[in-house]
């Protein structure tokens, strides 16, 4: 009933205030989604995850990255969704396809997928004004053991970050600490320039989700928050640069491999 909802809401706000008194940085109301918003985000996530499943079934050596983008457009539109990436701040395509030493924002084009490549496909899908965001790594043909290990450890970094999410107990910083610890233990570095983010009615919302231990205080994690965790893990140096071919694609400074896995998470 409306009364139960009001009581529940009031108790939640009271609990937040208590945590604030104890020195915690608490999330604002925009960061906490209601049931209706959560259901809408879930609908977008079903299409977005379905798209990545579809790509997993069809991606192959000899295909261009543009072919993957074409697949994404066809799948998303036929399932009642649309790409949030297309025309976002002028981005020209519907997904990002980042190959080998490309860290993120690889633009689909005429690059032909080769035996031994690793590729990240990152998709953000909108359905009725709500969004979900995820990315996966795909390995093509005979991939080196070093590349396989990077892909595996990067996925584990995402999983460690997710395990650190404990409502009313952990803060956003705990996610970054868990990711960084696992990456460093395996001899890898964490890209610091790009982070996860809140998501819902916009593709990028607060909070900013670090993949390393930040210096500043971060918000308490509470039920109803929806955000992405999307670590980019490098084989060599963490340092990166924008390529000269476009205003989007980012590369590792040393030309070594980079990998990323991403989930949208509901607390």
Predicted regions and their residues:
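Short Cys/His-based metal-binding microdomains
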Residues: 1-20
């Amino acid at each position: 009933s409306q009364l139960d909802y009001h009581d529940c809401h009031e108790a939640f706000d009271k609990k937040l205030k208590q945590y604030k008194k104890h020195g915690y940085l608490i999330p604002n109301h925009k960061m906490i989604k209601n049931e209706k918003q959560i259901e809408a985000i879930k609908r977008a996530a079903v299409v977005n995850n379905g798209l990545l499943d579809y790509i997993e079934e069809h991606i192959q050596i000899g295909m261009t990255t543009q072919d993957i983008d074409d697949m994404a457009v066809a799948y998303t539109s036929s399932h009642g969704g649309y790409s949030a990436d297309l025309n976002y701040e002028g981005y020209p395509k519907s997904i990002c396809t980042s190959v080998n030493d490309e860290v993120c924002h690889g633009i689909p084009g005429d690059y032909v997928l080769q035996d031994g490549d690793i590729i990240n496909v990152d998709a953000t899908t909108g359905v009725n004004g709500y969004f979900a965001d995820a990315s996966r790594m795909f390995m093509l043909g005979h991939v080196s053991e070093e590349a396989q290990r990077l892909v595996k450890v990067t996925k584990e970094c995402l999983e460690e970050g997710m395990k650190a999410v404990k409502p009313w107990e952990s803060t956003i910083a705990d996610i970054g600490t868990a990711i960084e610890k696992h990456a460093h233990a395996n001899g890898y570095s964490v890209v610091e320039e790009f982070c996860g983010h809140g998501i819902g009615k916009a593709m990028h919302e607060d909070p900013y989700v670090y993949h390393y231990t930040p210096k500043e205080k971060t918000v308490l994690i509470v039920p109803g928050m929806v955000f992405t965790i999307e670590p980019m893990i490098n084989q060599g140096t963490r340092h990166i640069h924008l390529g000269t071919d476009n205003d989007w694609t980012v590369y590792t400074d040393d030309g070594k491999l980079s990998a990323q896995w991403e989930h949208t998470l509901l607390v």
